[in-house]
Amino acid sequence: FISVFLIFYSRLNKKFENTKGTQIIMRYTLRALTIDQFSRIASTICAAEILRKENSNLFGDKEITLGLWVGQKQTPNWYSEAAKVINNPNSQAESTPRQLINCPCCKNQLLYTAQDDEKKINVECVSPESKNTCEIQKKLNSLPILTVDECLYNNLPTFLLATIDKFAQIIRKDEALGFLGKKGFSSPPSLIIQDELHLITGPLGTLT
């Protein structure tokens, strides 16, 4: 609730009117927990994006998006890797952009497609059964989620979910500095949330 409030409050104040900043960062210690929370938060972000589109005069034209930033074993680092997985229906790759399987609204399976001209992964609800009932299918051309590192760097998400081990790499990944408002015209986040703080020990905890 606090995160969504901050997103809309900032837009009402025009703070993010001309920026590409990440406003909320939530960090988890366990990758499995991060993936689980990603599917839950996706429904909230989709609802927020629908609300923004319906009230663009108040909240601006910039899309409200959700990003997932975890290890390479879970999600691809590059768009080209993600496109190969999506374009090959028989792919058994463990690293995949398909981290959200079902539509948060109607629960039907989502369709992932690769858009090479913009290096973008489109995520759509196209189920015929929910054509007239699914708010996401009716109001969003593509779900506002990003699961490929390259796409995250090029289009900073409004809300970023990350694991602390991935986040620790920010000191040697110049392209990731945008998440903290340290690159280009991006603004720093309004809120950083660390989940399960007591689990962070040793050098990793010191670094993060």
Residues covered by each model-derived region:
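N-terminal helicase ATP-binding lobe
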Residues: 1-208
